[in-house]
């Protein structure tokens, strides 16, 4: 069951955890509107109140179609609530196939929208500082929106620009000048991160662990060894643009106005007929069978204590995506009630609550939004019942050396290290659906592409029990 929050609104699921608190999903039980609620415990760290105040101030400045909306905030004692748009198309990383990428025309379209969002941010003096696919969300029309401004800062005010000196972001996406511990301009740093995102979209992999001379892949790039991966998978026109973006000297790096003049950026790409997308989870979608799904618009980046610009802040996590609700344009009057309300209580096991449609189905409603499954590429049906499927999963985890625990009814939390020796955590739910068992994988912390690689490895180990049954998502 959902937990009442304020009048007509329920808290129905935890979306992510971070250094200072968590993100919950709030749903209006009458209109089915959905809003992400960032719940912050201000006592978690000395610098928490100042950081949250800064995040709220920045969010209040934002209003653009390619940036997530900020609805408002309120505080109760030591708890601060931030209310934000809840996007319905998922995270960008879910559209990137590991080691393959995505169709070039899709990458170009997303890159256009990313540029539009970044141009807007820079135009009002804001730098994001943690641009990556986990922080780029899609709405129900596949329009890209930039999310999570926990590391963002103002670099220009009243036409006066200040240099930055803080190391923050996610290592594979940061610009090389950040690692030199010197002052640097803000805008070229975001441009560099956008270039890494474009590389990931076109090649399905990140080019290096970090842009330093100690990294062989980065040295190879500087020596123009484009016959190596990932560059050899990228066509010459977009590769030429990447050669202008991923330039070590920030003063020589291409600017966004010049990116917009680039040949590939302006090249009309033939989209052709829209084909059903075969997914790595044995699912498919078609233009006649599409279900909206909801994902969080927050990434809780870990923040170290201390507020000076010299602090190192690297992000390595993102929220867990997680329920299949219809999302309509959120009405201001309803959100006002949510922002101003005062009642709050905590769900005991929200992940299981929402994944198991039997728990939240409303009697008499054969197609109510609670029963719609999240559309995601990382899932499959098994040929076994729940208990036997669970046993096979446990055996596979042990063979692969994963740490795991049963964290909730029909849910397993798995921890491991990725190829960069960073923590990777994902959750697996076993869901009974049409008398079949669906094994649903969701990223909790870590790199999205690494998560998908581990999913494919696990699925391969379980090939004997994986069903070929596909799910066709209904029109909503």
Swiss-Prot record:
Q: Which gene encodes it?
A: Chek1
The UniProt similarity line reads:
Belongs to the protein kinase superfamily. CAMK Ser/Thr protein kinase family. NIM1 subfamily.
EC identifiers of the protein = 2.7.11.1
- Tell me, which GO biological process terms does this entry list? apoptotic process; apoptotic process involved in development; cellular response to caffeine; cellular response to mechanical stimulus; chromatin remodeling; DNA damage checkpoint signaling; DNA damage response; DNA repair
Q: What is this protein called?
A: Serine/threonine-protein kinase Chk1
What does the domain comment read? The autoinhibitory region (AIR) inhibits the activity of the kinase domain.
**Region Disordered: start and end of each range?**
267-329
Ways its activity is controlled = Activated through phosphorylation predominantly by ATR but also by ATM in response to DNA damage or inhibition of DNA replication. Activation is modulated by several mediators including CLSPN, BRCA1 and FEM1B. Proteolytic cleavage at the C-terminus by SPRTN during normal DNA replication activates the protein kinase activity.
List residues binding ATP: 15-23, 38
Q: Which UniProt keywords apply?
A: ATP-binding, Cell cycle, Chromosome, Cytoplasm, Cytoskeleton, DNA damage, DNA repair, Isopeptide bond, Kinase, Nucleotide-binding, Nucleus, Phosphoprotein, Serine/threonine-protein kinase, Transferase, Ubl conjugation
Instruction: Return the InterPro entries for the record.
Output: Chk1_catalytic_dom, Kinase-like_dom_sf, Prot_kinase_dom, Protein_kinase_ATP_BS, Ser/Thr_kinase_AS
The record, for Pfam families, names:
Pkinase
Comp. bias intervals (Polar residues): 298-320
> Which superkingdom is the protein from?
Eukaryota
Spans through the membrane = none
GO CC term (a single one): chromosome, telomeric region
Q: Where's the active site on this chain? A: 130
Catalytic activity reads: L-seryl-[protein] + ATP = O-phospho-L-seryl-[protein] + ADP + H(+); L-threonyl-[protein] + ATP = O-phospho-L-threonyl-[protein] + ADP + H(+)
Record PTM Phosphoserine, positions in chain: 280, 286, 296, 301, 317, 345, 463, 467-468
Q: Where is the composition biased (Low complexity)?
A: 280-291
Site of covalent link Glycyl lysine isopeptide (Lys-Gly) (interchain with G-Cter in ubiquitin) = 132, 436
């Amino acid at each position: 069951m959902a937990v009442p929050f304020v009048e007509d609104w329920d808290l129905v699921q935890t979306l992510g955890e971070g250094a200072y608190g968590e993100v919950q999903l709030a749903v209006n039980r009458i209109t089915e509107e959905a809003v992400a609620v960032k719940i912050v415990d201000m006592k978690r760290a000395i610098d928490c109140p100042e950081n949250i105040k800064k995040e709220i101030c920045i969010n209040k400045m934002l209003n653009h179609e390619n940036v997530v909306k900020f609805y408002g905030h309120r505080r109760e004692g030591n708890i601060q609530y931030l209310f934000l748009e809840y996007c319905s198309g998922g995270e960008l990383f879910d559209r990137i196939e590991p080691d393959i990428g995505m169709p070039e025309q899709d990458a170009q379209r997303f890159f256009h929208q990313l540029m539009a969002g970044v141009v807007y941010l820079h135009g009002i003096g804001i730098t994001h500082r943690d641009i990556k696919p986990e922080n780029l969300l899609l709405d129900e029309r596949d329009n890209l929106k930039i999310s999570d401004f926990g590391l963002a800062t103002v670099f220009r005010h009243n036409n006066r620009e200040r240099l930055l000196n803080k190391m923050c972001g996610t290592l594979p996406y940061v610009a090389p000048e950040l690692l030199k511990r010197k002052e640097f301009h803000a805008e070229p740093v975001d441009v560099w991160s956008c270039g890494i995102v474009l590389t990931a979209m076109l090649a399905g992999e990140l080019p290096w662990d970090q842009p330093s001379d100690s990294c062989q892949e980065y040295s190879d790039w500087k020596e123009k060894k484009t016959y190596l991966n990932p560059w050899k998978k990228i066509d010459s026109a977009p590769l030429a643009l990447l050669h202008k973006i991923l330039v070590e000297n920030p003063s020589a790096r291409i600017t966004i106005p010049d990116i917009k003049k680039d040949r590939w950026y302006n090249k009309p790409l033939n989209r052709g007929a829209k084909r059903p997308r075969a997914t790595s989870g044995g699912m498919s979608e078609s233009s006649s069978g599409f279900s909206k799904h909801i994902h969080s618009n927050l990434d809780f980046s870990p923040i170290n204590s201390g507020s000076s610009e010299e602090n190192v802040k690297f992000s390595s996590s993102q929220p867990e995506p997680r329920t299949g609700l219809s999302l309509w344009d959120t009405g201001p009057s309803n959100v006002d009630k949510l922002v101003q309300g005062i009642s709050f209580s905590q769900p005991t096991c929200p992940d299981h609550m929402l994944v198991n449609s039997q728990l939240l189905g409303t009697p008499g409603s054969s197609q109510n939004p609670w029963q719609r499954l999240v559309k995601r590429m990382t899932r499959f049906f098994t040929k076994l019942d729940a208990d036997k499927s669970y046993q096979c999963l446990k055996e596979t985890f042990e063979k692969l050396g994963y740490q795991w625990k049963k964290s909730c009814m029909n849910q397993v939390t798995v921890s491991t290290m990725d190829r960069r020796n960073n923590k990777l955590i994902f959750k697996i739910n076993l869901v009974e659906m049409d008398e079949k068992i669906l094994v649903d994988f969701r990223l909790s912390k870590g790199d999205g592409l690494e998560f998908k690689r581990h999913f494919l490895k696990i699925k391969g180990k379980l090939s004997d029990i994986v069903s070929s049954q596909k799910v066709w998502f209904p029109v909503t």
